[in-house]
């Protein structure tokens, strides 16, 4: 069973995807970590003449071990590096193939990202699109950062999320455009336990419907 979980920044999709993976005993891939892992692999070569070639090679050699680098993957620096390698077409293609291979392993998987149900796995068995209003998403991200000891400017963080939302709206395959057959789940007023219960119920309903003769 392949479960695709999409949504905008800080919508809770990653936490929900991890919970679904535990519940259904499936492997989980946070696709947002992929470009960060590639960026970190070539961080000592930024600005070098062969930077793009090194990034392409790193993307093609990426394996699960690169996604266990701990908190370094979630730092702002890793985010900057991710943006530098994400503009390379060959890196993007390697990342798409990595995600498809992960999804289609025996037994399936849960993947969360921004275009899983539309671009990566249009054949997913269950597609969830997680949304929440921007204020709720900003507050969640602020609490997440504060839990790591990071000082947060909430107004600036909210502005950043609104800016990213605006960019996403300009991309027809981006995080604001769910697959036509995706199930929408608004988590604005839900805590993680309630959101996970709702997501599990959606998956169970889809599976039950498919099981009917």
Where are these regions (language model features)?
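Phosphate-binding beta-loop-alpha motif at adenosine-nucleotide cofactor sites
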Residues: 126, 131, 176-192
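Hydrophobic positions on the alpha1 helix immediately C-terminal to the Walker A/P-loop
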Residues: 16
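P-loop (Walker A) phosphate-binding loop of NTP-binding proteins
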Residues: 8
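Conserved lysine of the Walker
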Residues: 13
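Post-Walker A helix-loop "phosphate-sensing" segment adjacent to the P-loop in P-loop NTPases
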Residues: 21-31
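Hydrophobic anchor at the beta1->P-loop junction of P-loop NTPases
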Residues: 3-5
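ATP-dependent small-molecule kinase phosphotransfer cores
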Residues: 34-108, 118, 135-139, 143, ...
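C-terminal alpha-helix
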Residues: 198-209
């Amino acid at each position: 069973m392949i479960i695709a979980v999409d949504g905008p920044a800080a919508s809770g999709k990653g936490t929900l995807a991890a919970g679904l993976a535990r519940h259904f005993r499936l492997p989980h891939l946070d696709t947002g970590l992929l470009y960060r892992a590639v960026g970190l692999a070539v961080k000592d070569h930024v600005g070098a003449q062969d930077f793009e070639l090194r990034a392409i090679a790193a993307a093609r050699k990426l394996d699960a071990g690169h996604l266990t680098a701990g908190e370094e993957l979630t730092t702002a620096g890793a985010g900057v590096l991710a943006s530098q390698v994400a503009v390379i077409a060959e890196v993007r293609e390697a990342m798409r193939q990595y995600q498809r291979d992960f999804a289609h392993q025996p037994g399936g998987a849960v993947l969360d990202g921004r275009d899983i149900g539309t671009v990566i796995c249009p054949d997913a068995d269950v597609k969830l699109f997680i949304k929440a209003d921007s204020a709720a998403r900003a507050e969640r991200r602020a609490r997440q950062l504060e839990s790591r000891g990071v000082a947060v400017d909430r107004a600036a963080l909210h502005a950043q999320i609104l800016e990213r939302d605006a960019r996403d709206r300009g991309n027809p395959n981006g995080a604001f455009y769910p697959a036509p057959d995706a199930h929408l789940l608004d988590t604005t007023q839900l805590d993680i336990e309630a959101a996970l219960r709702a997501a599990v119920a959606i998956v169970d309903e889809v599976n039950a419907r498919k099981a009917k003769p």
